[in-house]
Every structure is written in structure tokens, then in C-alpha cells.
Amino acid sequence: MTLQKLVATAVLVALVSLILNNAAAFTPNWVYQTLEDGRKRSVGLWKSCWLVDRGKGVTSPGTRTGQVDTHDCEVLGWGSESAGFQESRGTVKLQFDMMRACNLVATAALVVGQITFILGLTGLPLMSPESQCWEEAMAAAFQLASFVLVIGLVTFYRIGPYTNLSWSCYLNIGACLLATLAAAMLIWNILHRREDCMAPRVIVISRSLTARFRRGLDNDYVESPC
């Protein structure tokens, strides 16, 4: 049995989702925050950087003259208070912690789906392309990734007046949509296969049965694949 193009396309879509999800996680452009003194900074899941306002000539603390093109960045982690600077610290800290956890779970689920696809190509008994469990395992992994990303993104439904969502957040939304699309393609393929198996068996009788007075007639028939 040859590998179905729909399954390969779904896995490719999930791979793009995995790339976008990691790109959104490791870029410091999840939100933009404006401080009272006019300084601006971009905050990501794992990094925060001060931005240089070229119009006003405002630079980040500790930046020397002539270094207007550099960013002063700091690493963020679980429960970082600096992510909520200028906003409600407790709320923003919870938002970023939730998104970090959901991002890691989604990454793991997408990687498991890719590994399942590769194992199926090796011809393992339980994960072969002929086994329906192979597609179901990939669909479950991609659907889990989509589900947890939705949970994480919903936490950013309400943000403070000094904060604006940036392109990394929208990049993660695209990753969520692609993971959903990959899971939907596999689920549709599974259901379509089941409908084919529920159809009645087709028996084609050989023309040799119409011959008269012939001994040893063979009842040749062809059944449906299911």
C-alpha cells in the first residue's frame, strides 16, 4: 500500500506549525510595552529587550552613545516579575507562564506526531501505513497541540493599556491554525476510510460460470479492500 498523499500533506502542515511555534517562542516580540518615561520594550516568552526610540533619542539603561542599533536584553523564566512591569504583575506573570507551558506541550505533541510518521515509514507492525492506529496517533498528537495553544492564546484576550500584541503572538496563532488543519485532514481521512469499509462487499462472478457442461468451474470473485 502506497503512502497516501493526504497523510503526507497533513504531516508537512504540522511541520510548518512546529517551526512557527518555536519561532514565536524564542523571539522577543510577543508584546510591546510602553513605560511612563517614554521608553519601549518588547517582551517574549523567554526574553525581553529594550527598544531604541530613534525619533526621541531615548536609549535603554546602560547603553553607550553610538549604540542606538543594539538591544539590551534580559532572559525571562518561569514566574518572571519583569514581564509584568508597568502592568499588573500577577496577571501578566500568569499569562506568560501559561503560554510557556502550552508552547512546550504543543512542541512536544507536534514532535511526537512527526516521530510517529517516521516510525510508520520504517514498517513497524503497530505503526505501519496499513494500520489505522498510525493515522489516529498522529491526529491525536496534532489535535492536542492545537488544543493547548488555544488555551495559552486565550489568556492574552485581555491585556493592559500599556501593552500591545506583537507579531510573535500572531505567528503562534498561525501555528495553532495549521496544527488544527493537520489534525482535521487526518481525521477526515480516517472517517472516509471507515465509510469505505462499511460499504457492502462487491462480488464479481466470472464469465466462466455461464459456460454449459463445463467441469471444474472456479468461482472467481473480487472483494472490496475492506
From Swiss-Prot:
One of its GO terms (cellular component) is plasma membrane. Coiled coil: none annotated. It is a multi-pass membrane protein. It is found in: Cell junction, Adherens junction; Cell membrane. The chain crosses the membrane at residues 6-26, 104-124, 137-157, 171-191. Residues 1-5, 125-136, 192-226 are cytoplasmic. Residues 27-103, 158-170 are extracellular. Signal peptide: none annotated. InterPro entries: TMEM204. GO terms for biological process: lymph vessel development; regulation of vascular endothelial growth factor receptor signaling pathway; smooth muscle cell differentiation. It comes from the Eukaryota. Keywords: Cell junction, Cell membrane, Glycoprotein, Membrane, Transmembrane, Transmembrane helix. Gene3D superfamilies: 1.20.140.150. Glycans are attached at N164. Can influence paracellular permeability. Appears to be involved in cell-cell interactions through adherens. This is Transmembrane protein 204. It comes from Mus musculus (Mouse). The lineage of its organism: Eukaryota, Metazoa, Chordata, Craniata, Vertebrata.
